[in-house]
């Protein structure tokens, strides 16, 4: 049995899709999994402000359309990217085992209190404003490694990333930045 998994092309998306493929192969004897790698509108429009252009659906719509057209059997998303309501005809069929749910404050080396924090997430901005009331916020886009490079280079003093994504990519340190996991009372993670 061949199962086609629709996924984004980012390194984290591919790691997560391979994890799903491994679970499917373990659960379904003889299953072969193939990844259908899709570039989404959110990937293509790196200059857009996500909150002003459609938010989460920018990273999921093309994968969902591939399902509806019968080009894929499964779409693999980070749960934080799912819209509040599922597209008619689609269901959430499963989840990967739970990872560390905490967010990680990524500080440029030498910075203790960030003056500028780069995050495109309104949820994270609101929570970080409580911790750093004098900080200003800027948008940041790109894959995890791109974001880490931007902070190390001084684009902003800090950003915030999901510990789960860092763990799945095997990133536990990075030159020029310090990882500071946030307690759940400091930063409530995304649903899922």
Q: What does each model-identified segment do?
A:
Residues 1-192:
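Domain-level signature for soluble enzymes in the chorismate/prephenate branch of the shikimate pathway
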């Amino acid at each position: 049995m061949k199962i086609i998994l629709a996924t984004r092309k980012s390194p984290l998306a591919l790691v997560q899709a391979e994890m799903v493929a491994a679970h499917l192969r373990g659960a379904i004897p003889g299953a072969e999994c193939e990844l259908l790698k899709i570039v989404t509108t959110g990937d293509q429009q790196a200059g857009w402000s996500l909150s002003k252009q459609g938010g989460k659906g920018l990273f999921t719509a093309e994968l969902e359309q591939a399902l509806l057209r019968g080009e894929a059997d499964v779409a693999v998303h980070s749960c934080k990217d799912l819209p509040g309501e599922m597209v008619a005809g689609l269901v959430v069929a499963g989840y990967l085992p739970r990872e560390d749910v905490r967010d990680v404050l990524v500080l440029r080396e030498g910075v203790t209190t960030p003056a500028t924090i780069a995050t495109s997430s309104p949820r994270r901005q609101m929570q970080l404003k409580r911790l750093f009331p004098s900080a200003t916020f800027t948008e940041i886009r790109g894959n995890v490694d791109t974001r880490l490079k931007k902070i190390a280079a001084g684009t902003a003093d800090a950003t915030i990333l999901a510990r789960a994504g860092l763990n799945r990519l095997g990133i536990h340190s990075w030159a020029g930045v310090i990882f500071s996991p946030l307690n759940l009372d400091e930063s409530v993670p995304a649903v899922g």
